[in-house]
Amino acid sequence: MDAYNNPSAVESGDAAVKSVDDDGREKRTGTFWTASAHIITAVIGSGVLSLAWAIAQLGWVAGTTVLVAFAIITYYTSTLLADCYRSPDSITGTRNYNYMGVVRSYLGGKKVQLCGVAQYVNLVGVTIGYTITASISLVAIGKSNCYHDKGHKAKCSVSNYPYMAAFGIVQIILSQLPNFHKLSFLSIIAAVMSFSYASIGIGLAIATVASGKIGKTELTGTVIGVDVTASEKVWKLFQAIGDIAFSYAFTTILIEIQDTLRSSPPENKVMKRASLVGVSTTTVFYILCGCIGYAAFGNQAPGDFLTDFGFYEPYWLIDFANACIALHLIGAYQVYAQPFFQFVEENCNKKWPQSNFINKEYSSKVPLLGKCRVNLFRLVWRTCYVVLTTFVAMIFPFFNAILGLLGAFAFWPLTVYFPVAMHIAQAKVKKYSRRWLALNLLVLVCLIVSALAAVGSIIGLINSVKSYKPFKNLD
């Protein structure tokens, strides 16, 4: 009996059509809210608590100016990139599933390989950095309890390696989530955690200011000859500008986030709104944490006023804030790892399409979770990746200094150059027109910022290597 005479067959056919998008892939269900959660999870990292240090290097005027300037730059370039998700038309064109795909559609050539190297090296570096940062936050909980029991002058030495291993085990489990589309719940939890610890940090800083026990501040930040030497002032100023610029960057995963959105309303419009909310929310927290933290600690602001013990009491609240940091980084790790997982798996699928080990999906029932899909290659490869990144984090606990350098190299091409170049190609901006000149001036200024930040990061890395002692407990 044909479908014409079989209503149930027609209905099942309609259901099959409705369950897929215009590109034949599983129907996307992402919304403005899930995209906003992904962005906030990616952007508001524990680095928000180090912004008081950055403001201390720059001072009140330059510090707040740089914060606002890079918020505007990041939002603007993210809107340009959002319009490139589909090509050639931003609403009806063909979908591009990742950043490399977008660059391939608009620019092509060697720029595709440059994009891939910058993006995926940065993503891998971030996951290693998050492993280290999460362990530092968990160590801080143990040290906070020690200081509470034995006094603030007590020697409280705690190893961060067991915490790194525990973080790695959690990531092995979460890494079995098949793709970015399944991360919404994790990003929402992580976003709530980021609001929690940032709010606690702001509250503690306000309490310190209200108590009158505040540090000395200056319009121009740290004072040469008092707080720092002339050379230290220069290097730390470069590093602070870089830290602020990189703290806004989420374009490395913007296309992957946009690829989770349902097609109506148009993805680019939803992504622009989500970017505005994400960047605006981030900027408010950054200014509050940076400026109030600087007001509280002055030119002696610590690198992180929770894990570096800018505060000791109430210890239970500081413990809770550090636990929130660790929980946030659990989700953030996946937000940055999933695009790299998919990149490797898609390339393996293309290279060995007949391999059951790589391509076959098995259905399995897991207690409390229900029916889950298991792929042997995904299980083995992602487990190996997490084990490797955890091992690197253990060997190089100063990797965050390396991460600053990676951020310097990735910020300019991924956040500024490629979005601007693709916008010029898409909108056919006339060469040497006012708009073309303004866009290229923006590219040049951000290139200089990245270069200066890279120099500052290299100096910091050299100092870290000099004092490096492998497998040493954190004092």
UniProtKB/Swiss-Prot annotation:
What if the gene is knocked out? Answer: Reduced seed number and silique size correlated with a specifically altered amino acid composition of young siliques.
Question: Which Pfam families does the UniProt record give?
Answer: Aa_trans
Q: Which UniProt keywords apply?
A: Amino-acid transport, Cell membrane, Membrane, Symport, Transmembrane, Transmembrane helix, Transport
Tissues and organs where the protein is expressed, per its UniProt entry: Expressed in flower buds, siliques, developing seeds and funiculi.
Question: What gene is this protein translated from?
Answer: AAP8
InterPro entries associated with the record: AA_transpt_TM (IPR013057)
- Record function comment: Amino acid-proton symporter. Stereospecific transporter with a broad specificity for glutamate, aspartate and neutral and acidic amino acids.
Q: Where is this region: Disordered?
A: 1-22
Ranges facing Extracellular side: 142-157, 207-236, 298-314, 399-401, 463-475
The entry's cellular-component GO terms read: membrane; plasma membrane
Write the lineage as a comma-separated list.
Answer: Eukaryota, Viridiplantae, Streptophyta, Embryophyta, Tracheophyta
Q: What is this protein called?
A: Amino acid permease 8
Q: Which GO terms describe its molecular function?
A: symporter activity
List membrane-spanning regions: 32-52, 53-73, 121-141, 158-178, 186-206, 237-257, 277-297, 315-335, 379-398, 402-424, 442-462
- Membrane side Cytoplasmic: which residues? 1-31, 74-120, 179-185, 258-276, 336-378, 425-441
Protein topology in the membrane:
Multi-pass membrane protein
- Gene Ontology biological-process entries: amino acid transport
Family (UniProt)? Belongs to the amino acid/polyamine transporter 2 family. Amino acid/auxin permease (AAAP) (TC 2.A.18.2) subfamily.
Where in or outside the cell is it found?
Cell membrane
